[in-house]
Amino acid sequence: MNTTQSEKLYAQALDFMPGGVNSPVRACRSVGRTPLFIDRAEGSKIYDVDGNEFIDYICSWGPNILGHKQPDVIKAVTSACQNGLTFGACHSGEIELAELIRKNMPSIEMLRLVNSGTEAVMSAIRVARGFTKRDKIVKFEGCYHGHSDGLLVKGGSGLLTNSIPNSAGVPKGYTDTTLLAKYNDEESVQQLFDNCGDEIACVIVEPCAANMGVVPPKKGFLKFLREITEKHGSLLIFDEVITGFRLSLGGAQKLYGVKPDLTTLGKIVGGGMPLAVYGGRKEIMECVAPLGSVYQAGTLSGNPVAVSAGIATLKILEKNKDSIYPELERKSAKIENAMKNAGLNVNRVGSIMTAFFTDKKVVDYDTATTADTKRYAEYYNRLLENGIYAAPSQFEAMFVSFAHTEDDIEKTCQVIESFK
């Protein structure tokens, strides 16, 4: 595979950006490569500057559930651009998108539009603290909630990929109020509440973890979190930046039947544009300025172009939910079976999955980190050399889109099954 142009561009990028990238995992260091530079994408395919074609299972880290360059989404964005790129003012699209979200996720009675998952989570936690008048928060080892200071403690995603358990540059005081629990471990949560339950503002969790690889919740775990937070007057926040509108039209909360107090959304809700959401119970969200004293604002919040992409995407998902989600499940199950046929240890929930290179059943951060990252690098490079574009990290998810064709799935399965 010729990557001459990508290598030249990467050499230039190193002079301008740390590691030559704008997000650490993209540097591909954990898989022993330099990154590909992408020229264009359409449907299920992505094309690099050297003309190589790949079947894309990164899907921009989750947003592209409909595939790249979906015609209705492109049309909506193009039309919105004709009216101006940003207003810094109210517009009707904000209401239309909010209605679509609330209709499909009834736990979100009131919401705010922001620009990234990090911003959504940061704001949701501030709201939880303001509402409860408490400072401490509980997060889980291996769960990643963006790069705000108080949450960069044993995080997943790029932190785990690059073996950085806690980020430098974060004063100790920022994380003193962050309490760590083990994912899928009720006892570890119970101990925290036994010790200081009346000081805990919220528990934030990925209802299906997807940033230490895909790790589904054990039966009853989310229900336990709902019950213990209610008992102690704490709020339950579901970080559905990845799972929202992907595991079902109503997200993980509908799939698992557990209703959080607050939810954060990103990726799919913006249709491929920078847009995220935080929202929840009306009485909680009324704490946000100008109604309340919890402050949050943003120059580009509710950007009309991003909102148009979100509306178009959610309308397609809503209109075609009875065909899209079963189709995603069927295609994803085929790939999962191919992984199992190759002897791989796979976790899958809906259209997200991870093949873990470990003999242990992966249920939390400790078991995820037993994975052989060198073996994963071999697997990644085998896929790439055969035209399959997967995450350059053992600890990221593989995403299936509605645009993946039968031929795509068949080829992918053949390449995976050849890796033994």
Where are these regions (language model features)?
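Conserved N-terminal phosphate-binding loop of PLP-dependent enzymes in the Aspartate aminotransferase
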Residues: M1-K420
